[in-house]
Amino acid sequence: MKLSTQTEYLGARFGEAEAIRMIAKAGFDAFDLSLFYMNSQPQHPMNQSEFREYAKSLRAVADECGIKCNQAHAPFPTSVGDEEKDEAAFALVVRAMEAAAIVGAEMIVVHPKHHLSYRTHARELEELNLAFYRRLLPYCEQFRIKVACENMWQHNREAGRIIDSTCSRPQEFLEYLTKLNSPWIVACLDVGHTALTDEDLPAFVRTLGKTQLQALHVHDNDLRADLHTMPYMGKIDFATFTAALKEIGYEGDFTFEADQFLAAFPDPLAPAALDLLHKVGRHLKTQCE
């Protein structure tokens, strides 16, 4: 099990190459390449014709630092309900898959479509998503990279609270994967999202099981908002979570998505904050093994 964290905040602040160097220097085994800026930043290097060369340059930095890209995160949202925009989003996901594979990732997290109200359109969303992930399969085989579906949430603006969305319930998530029936499509369990939708986190782990659960997004929150902060800064019970991972014999990596913790610190303290995140990760990782 590798200990990993994402490049998102450090990459935006210091550049992606330097983010990789910082993550390696802090002692992490791997990094999660954040590619979700591709849909909001047309000038991003991954959106240019030379994106393959840029991806190779990041791979060279990683190799020089002795660190691996264990997974990546594709651009999102993957749908807004407009055919032209959704096709453009699909093309970005495919490009992200290729770029991630070049950098060395064996897996990329791809959000399911959930632009419709889940409460009234759950079946329609399921049909859209099964077609969406099946459409990605040829690219999985071409680039030799797995796609990890993630459990989501929606926001009820009228009530001012978070509610269920695609794959937020463990049985539904498992049914998605069973129907897709491909070794290329697996589960990424977002720990924070699970807490926000009132799910029993250890039970979610056990329901997905060792075969389907192959990636994690680990972060903490106050059970009310998607804070993406470091474990032990919020209210999630990480002792029962790590015990469940150990129980099922989890064989994936332990990947943080806790960059809002890092965001609170000024530049000179970023390495120290990253070092603390690493130490917390090592502690949690030992509880899983």
Task: Annotate each PLM feature.
Residues 1-4, 9-29, 63, 106, ...:
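Histidine-acidic metal/acid-base catalytic patches
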Residues 15, 54, 92, 131-132, ...:
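Residue-level preference for nonpolar/small residues embedded in alpha-helices
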Residues 44-49, 85-86, 162-163, 228-232:
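Short glycine-enriched, charge-decorated loop/helix-capping segments at active-site entrances
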Residues 32-58, 226:
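Glycine-rich, proline-tolerant flexible connector loops at the mouths of alpha/beta enzymes
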Residues 56, 60-68, 78-186, 196, ...:
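Active-site acidic/histidine proton-transfer and metal-coordination neighborhood
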Residues 9-11, 35-37, 75-78, 112-116, ...:
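Active-site-proximal loop/turn and secondary-structure-junction residues that shape catalytic pockets
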